Amino acid sequence: LRSVTTACGNIAIGYMAGQATTNGDNTAIGFCAMHSNTSGEANVAIGLCASRAGTGARHNVAIGFRALDSSNTCGNVAIGYQAAYNQSSGKCNVVIGCQAMYNAAGGCEFVAVGHKAGYSNNADFNTAIGSCALYSNTTGTGNLAVGHCSLYASVTSNNNVAVGDEAIRNNTTGASNVALGA
């Protein structure tokens, strides 16, 4: 909080944590946690460089090394090593897992749980549970992928349900499919 002149209700613990904060009610714990936050408010960033590059994020929780690193949005929860790392415009997402939604710049109301779940997602209203579930999805919406690598290759597919290990793994554009089992 070295540069703070008007903000109130902030907590910063760690070298350069919350350094640029001008709004209030932020908690930054860890080296460079919430380092660039200027106008964001009511955020929690815990971990080395957690929510480091975001400038105007609001109501986010980032726990883990560089979790929610680029976020300027609101209502996101990212827990894990580089979880939601490139998330810059998505909102109301829940991301739990090492590099879950790592390369996803957008996407709203997405749930990703598991190592690299929803890795490239930029779409809305998807649920990916399991390691690499919905890994390649960029614009497909309304998908449910539960299981290791389920809907893995899906890029633009919509409204699919895949439950099981590698269920509908190689589908890239097909829509409205249901697969139960490996």
What are these regions (language model features)?
Residues 1-182:
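Glycine- and small/polar-enriched repetitive beta-structure motifs of secreted/surface proteins
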